Amino acid sequence: MKDRIERAAAFIKQNLPESPKIGLILGSGLGILADEIENPVKLKYEDIPEFPVSTVEGHAGQLVLGTLEGVSVIAMQGRFHFYEGYSMEKVTFPVRVMKALGVEALIVTNAAGGVNTEFRAGDLMIITDHINFMGTNPLIGPNEADFGARFPDMSSAYDKDLSSLAEKIAKDLNIPIQKGVYTAVTGPSYETPAEVRFLRTMGSDAVGMSTVPEVIVANHAGMRVLGISCISNAAAGILDQPLSHDEVMEVTEKVKAGFLKLVKAIVAQYE
């Protein structure tokens, strides 16, 4: 895997004016943030050696390199999901490449179902912790000592200082913000009402089909992580209506202004 990471990183470096400090993974409907990047260099995933290709609506499938609020960044406009048939190694491959390019911190975003009955569609939630309900882990297999420890600590998977900064900025900008625990499931079927009741009993506030694999690998690699969920719908059983991906896209479209302001301000104040 090391050789493949180096090949991808070498190709991307040819297009990099400077080493990026922050990596951004933009979830369903949230790729609009990449359009805010100044002096952008756009690389389609299919043109990058060893990169998988995104197949989900709302995911553009390209890397965008440049500056955001004066900070050098690299953004994934579209991520890879386990349910698409990719191995966990491929799902998390871009995080390894970001680390090889010099990224210090990862801001990972997603659209998620609200498990907490106090949450409403359109809320933004700072992820304080997660539950891995995917039945697997991206670190299974031989450990590359150069990448990180065999048994990485996950007691502070989400950087407390970055989370506090995000909360403070949201309050300063009058952007309503929630905090909570995100649960990752494999999908692609949405959860049943019984599963959602179970997740709520376990202490989950939101549920989705991504994020946790990337966060585990980022922690393994020694990167700081900030996670933000857009609560795109109430999870199954809370409202008397079926769930759809179209609904997810509609809600993320409505919250994009607040989301953009929040993430740009976080990047601007990153230290």
Curated annotation (Swiss-Prot):
It holds the Pfam family PNP_UDP_1. The modification Phosphoserine is found at residue 28. It comes from the Bacteria. It is an enzyme of class 2 (transferase). Homotrimer. SUPFAM superfamilies: Purine and uridine phosphorylases. A purine D-ribonucleoside binds at residues 191, 233. Its EC number is 2.4.2.1. GO terms for molecular function: purine-nucleoside phosphorylase activity. This is Purine nucleoside phosphorylase 1. The purine nucleoside phosphorylases catalyze the phosphorolytic breakdown of the N-glycosidic bond in the beta-(deoxy)ribonucleoside molecules, with the formation of the corresponding free purine bases and pentose-1-phosphate. Cleaves guanosine, inosine, 2'-deoxyguanosine and 2'-deoxyinosine. One of its GO terms (cellular component) is cytoplasm. InterPro entries: Nucleoside_phosphorylase_d, Nucleoside_phosphorylase_sf, Pur_Nuc_Pase_Ino/Guo-sp, Purine_phosphorylase, Purine_phosphorylase-2_CS. Signal peptide: none annotated. CDD domains: PNP-EcPNPII_like (cd09009). Pathway: Purine metabolism; purine nucleoside salvage. Belongs to the PNP/MTAP phosphorylase family. Keywords: Glycosyltransferase, Phosphoprotein, Transferase. One of its GO terms (biological process) is nucleoside metabolic process. It catalyses: a purine 2'-deoxy-D-ribonucleoside + phosphate = a purine nucleobase + 2-deoxy-alpha-D-ribose 1-phosphate. The lineage of its organism: Bacteria, Bacillati, Bacillota, Bacilli, Bacillales. Phosphate binds at residues 28, 59, 79-81, 111, 210.
